[in-house]
């Protein structure tokens, strides 16, 4: 789904930057689907493993108004509030006026919480979970669960609806998609995608935001 969504919003010979690119698997797959696209990755912790993918040392090194699509797949749930603000500021600065910010995050409420918590317990070979039984029930019915102070290694308590509210402060959300149940209510899926466009006033004021 990520490759299809980005392919659909990327202009011919466009530039795509993947924030939190890891070893570059997504950009590699995108390059196979769209050989015309320039691929740039940024990751504070990992090096690229695919020779066709170039990494930038920092987001500040990307020229203003030079990017067609900025992606942030499965990373926003691990950012502190100030880091998320910095990412959105960078997006407004580097995106072209008609560019797109494409985000995906896990859905940690609704029915998906049960298999996700169960899977975590199986993988860790433990009967203990970050979630108490009460918190699992709260998450199942869409109630918010408190987040740990450190979001780096956990999804607990992440609420995509709160992220959407923050993003909507600076971007217009053109489209949303759910996986693996795209035509069903969000509480039946486990992943949430947003295609976001800079608001006109935000784009013009990006220098102030940065």
Question: Model segments located where?
Answer:
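Conserved alpha-helix/loop element of class I SAM-dependent methyltransferases that forms part
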Residues: 1-13
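Local beta-strand N-terminus motif with an aromatic residue
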Residues: 13, 67-68
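Conserved class I S-adenosyl-L-methionine
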Residues: 13-22
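Residues at the starts of beta-strands that form the adenosine-phosphate
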Residues: 15, 38, 100
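Class I SAM-dependent methyltransferase SAM/SAH-binding core
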Residues: 22-60
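S-adenosyl-L-methionine-dependent methyltransferase catalytic module, highlighting the catalytic core
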Residues: 25, 29, 60, 80-96, ...
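A conserved beta-strand element that flanks and buttresses the S-adenosyl-L-methionine
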Residues: 71
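Short catalytic micro-motifs in class I SAM-dependent methyltransferases
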Residues: 74-78
């Amino acid at each position: 789904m990520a490759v299809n969504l980005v392919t659909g919003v990327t202009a011919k010979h466009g530039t795509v930057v993947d924030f939190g690119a890891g070893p570059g698997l997504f950009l590699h797959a995108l390059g196979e689907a769209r050989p015309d696209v320039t691929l740039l990755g940024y990751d504070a912790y990992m090096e690229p493993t695919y020779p066709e993918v170039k990494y930038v040392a920092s987001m500040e090194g990307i020229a203003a108004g030079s990017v067609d699509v900025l992606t942030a797949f499965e990373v926003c749930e691990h950012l502190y509030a100030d880091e998320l603000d910095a990412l959105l500021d960078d997006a407004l600065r580097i995106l072209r006026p008609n560019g797109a910010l494409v985000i995906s995050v896990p859905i940690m409420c609704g029915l998906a919480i049960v298999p996700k918590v169960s899977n975590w317990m199986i993988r860790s070979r433990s009967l203990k979970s970050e979630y108490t039984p009460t918190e699992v029930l709260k998450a199942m019915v869409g109630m918010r669960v408190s987040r740990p102070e450190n979001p780096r290694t956990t999804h607990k308590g992440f609420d995509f609806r709160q992220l959407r509210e923050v993003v909507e402060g600076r971007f217009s959300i053109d489209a949303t998609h759910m996986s693996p149940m795209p035509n069903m209510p969000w509480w039946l899926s486990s992943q949430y995608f947003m295609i976001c466009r800079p608001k006109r006033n935000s784009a013009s004021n990006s220098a102030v935001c940065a």
